[in-house]
Amino acid sequence: VAMALQAHDGYSFRFWRDARTDPRLRGPAREVLDRVGLGARAGVPAANLAHGEQRQLELAVALATGPSLLLLDEPMAGMGPEDSVRMVELLGTLKGKVTILWVEHDMDAVFALADRVTVLVYGKAIATGAPEEIRADPHVLQAYLGEEA
């Protein structure tokens, strides 16, 4: 996270200086980690974090750059139910602050977060609309549930 902040804020990279110990970066890095729920795990190497925590860390690195748009590819992939709920809550805190364009197969997460949904079947868009419209769309029901409309 500190390196993302370093790059975003225009600080020069110094080969012999560890970004994690730079006093200009420690506070902002900790704020981003707190924001994604990892403040208490700040000193833990990424490889030692649980899968869900690693996904939170990836999001923290992206948020450290101050994006106006986040592109997320299946942020819930490989997560258990508890981690998915935590990620949905975290992404929910970003609504209205950052535009998020994402691909996701966890429909509970999609319906909880999305303002607008486009459903693809074999790469072709079959429906676009609000979550409520998508839930009732006959083409979506046929394609994914095999139900007659």
Task: Identify the residue ranges that each predicted region occupies.
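Glycine-rich phosphate-binding loops of nucleotide-dependent enzymes
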Residues: V1-A149
